[in-house]
Amino acid sequence: MDKRLLRLIVVTIVLVCSVGAQAQRRNSRYVTYIDKYKDLAIEQMKEHKIPASITLAQGLLESGAGMSELARKSNNHFGIKCGGSWKGRTVRHDDDARQECFRAYKNPRDSYEDHSTFLTRGARYAFLFKLDITDYKGWARGLKKAGYATDPSYANRLITIIEDYDLYKYDAQGVYSKR
C-alpha cells in the first residue's frame, strides 16, 4: 500500500475518533438546556449587553441544566439570593448555609430577566460592562472577582462550559443580528 494513502487513512481514523470523543463528552442535558434557552439568552444580550455565552453558562452551572431543586421548584436558574431589596416571591434552600433565602419566579423567563437586571443594576458588576461584549473570559473572571459565586474555580468552570459547548457563537449572533 502506498505510504501516502496509509498516512491519509491513519489521519482520518484519528480525526474521526477525536470528533467522536468530543461528542461523547457533551452532556445531553446541557445540549437540551442550551437549545431551549439560547434564544432567550441572545434576547437578554441585545437588551442588557451581557454576553449570551455567560448567561447560558451561568444558567447551566447554577441550575444543573435546569435540573436542580432550586430551578425545578422556584424557576431560579442563576442561584440569586433574596437580598435586602427583593420584594418578590422567595424560597428557602440549603446552599453555603442552611435554609438561605432565594428568589422564586413564575417561570424561567422571569429568572433570565431578573438575572440581567441583577447584573446591570448591581454596582459591583458595573466594571463588567466596560469589557467587550464578546470577551466571555473577562466576564467570567469578573463575575468571580465581583463575588457572584463563592466557588474559587467559578470563572474556569464557566469558561470550560462556554468552550466545550461553543456558547461563544451565541455572542456573535447577539452582536451581528438585527434587533
Feature roles, as predicted:
Residues I9-S18:
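Bacterial N-terminal signal peptides
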Residues M1-I9:
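Bacterial N-terminal signal peptides that target proteins for export
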